[in-house]
Amino acid sequence: MTNRIGLFKKSWILGVAILVFQGCGTTKTLVFADKASVIAKINLINVVDDKVNVILDPAAFVADTVSFFIPKTVPGTYSDDNYGKYIEQFKALDYKGGELKVEKLDDNTWRIINAKDLDKIDYWVNDTYDTEVEVSDPVFSPSGTNILKGKNFMLNLHGFVGYFDGLEEIPYSLEISAPDGLEPVTSLVKGIQDVNRPETDIFVANRYFEVIDNPIMYSNPSTETFQVNDIAVTLSVYSPNGLFTAASLKAGMEKMMRGQKAFLGDINSTKHYTIILYLSNMDDNDAIGFGALEHHTSTVVVMPEQISKERLEEAIFDTVAHEFFHIVTPLTVHSNEIQYFDFNHPKMSMHLWMYEGTTEYFANLFQIQQGLITEEDFYQRLMEKIERSKTYDDRMSFIVMSKNILEEPYKKNYANVYEKGALINMALDINLRELSGGEKGVLWLMKELSKKYGDSKPFEDDKLIDEIIAMTYTEIGEFFNTNVIGNTPIDYDAYWKKVGLQTTEQEEATGYFFDGEVPYIDVDPANDNAIFVREGIQLNSFFNNLGAKGGDIIKSVDGKLTNLVNIRLLIGQSINWDSDKEIVMVVQRGDEEITLSGKVGVPTLDVVKLVPMEGAGEQQIKLREAWLKG
């Protein structure tokens, strides 16, 4: 996240804005490239070999060479995805239609020679969804692309449209030609429609960031719009087998977002918000990375289609709740590293504890404050986050991890931003409530920061924590220095005591392969549908007593090779297992094949519960009420 965007200063601006260019035997009037918009044309009608054609038409360059980029990474992904790998047949064309010399410098960069003669560039784009099971480092589906001729086009535009070096701040005009029957859903501003080209949609953006910040989905529309106070929300659903519609999900979504808006109060940075829901049929050429990617005024959510409505709604609501709260941070409150994001040489911010942690904390806190879940549900979520956070390095500085999140060993700890990141905010919230007599919490803090910073006013990355301390209490500085900047694990029991809670251990019954709807095993589509024991979760007594570990690949059970069919049968049979049944399970652990055996027993799970403390004092109960009820 560097300062290329917004800080590029042209050293060659001349006193005139118009040149007369001689070409093709005619006179062509051209504006300097830094004075006009880039026109990007995407053709969704003439799909060839699952690829679409893209043409970018800038104005005239005066430099001898110019570099063209497709993003290496984009905000919110915290990963190097190299979207340029999906670009093929790249050509730079002069005004006579001839090809200019192009040097490909890396996966995402093309240097165009004799750029003064450049008329346009022309290339083909392959999608990412149908490669997810083929590559070792697939693009996360919500930030990926889909080309399904005549049915669906998921246009995360960083996968289709690039930028010329130094021209990130000039306007873009997108001209997208689409088949009859497919309609676009996006928060991107529509331009003036050309009546002579009814098949072409025109969109406009003030700068390149606005292009990639506004995904578009073309599909046979299933769309609903509803009003949440002063925010117009659009929900669009693509369900390939027609199992779900926007209408079927609208009521629950509207209820949830009304709760979010009530929680946020006067924090608001948008008048419209678009939720794009893509449901995957789980074929080999479809999306398998489930989750969401946030944008300023929209979010892309990818989920499996073959689940119950209840489970889908639960997954969507938790996911969208998180993504919607990103309008607070980083979409409103953010650093220079995000405001001036460098898509190909990113400089990362040190504040993932806030960008993802605060957001995830709010996504859970608002539900208890708005009466959508019970206190017991909220406590259970916190305990689950503590349990999952233990699978990461608990002595890693969150500030150091965040600043270096694209590199190892920090990269493999990224998912902890949703676990310990949320818990950091919980501790900060309780500290603020305690020090302010219950009046101030993290929501108050974010409201204060949003008054000072906003969409076009970033903060300085290395000064934010000092600013927070100055706004609050010296004890908050001690907390940050110890548990966020420093590497000391959080003493959760101390925080439970502050609010009159305590932990207690209970043994609960589970299934052999499932705890309710939560599986202990999973399938790896990238490894011939291998069945493996899930990592990062607490295993039940069945797996623990056998000696199984997270990550073990189950090769066979009782002499029968495991595959998708056999494992389903085995799960069904396990319902009637006798506790004295002997079982032999062969697993692959790394390069070693290990035989595990023993009685199946009665499967149980040791669960740590968070419960009210007997004899809690009045101050503890008051602080708990302030924390949970706001």
What positions do the PLM features span?
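Bacterial signal peptide processing site
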Residues: 25-27
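C-terminal motif of bacterial Sec signal peptides marking the signal peptidase cleavage site
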Residues: 20-23
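Early extracytoplasmic/domain-onset interaction patches
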Residues: 29-73, 154-158
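Bacterial N-terminal signal peptides that target proteins for export
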Residues: 2-13
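C-terminal recognition in membrane/secretory proteostasis and scaffolding
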Residues: 363-364, 372-630
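Non-catalytic architectural context of zinc metalloproteases
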Residues: 80-89, 93-94, 99-258, 262-270, ...
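Juxtacatalytic substrate-recognition/specificity segment
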Residues: 56, 222-351
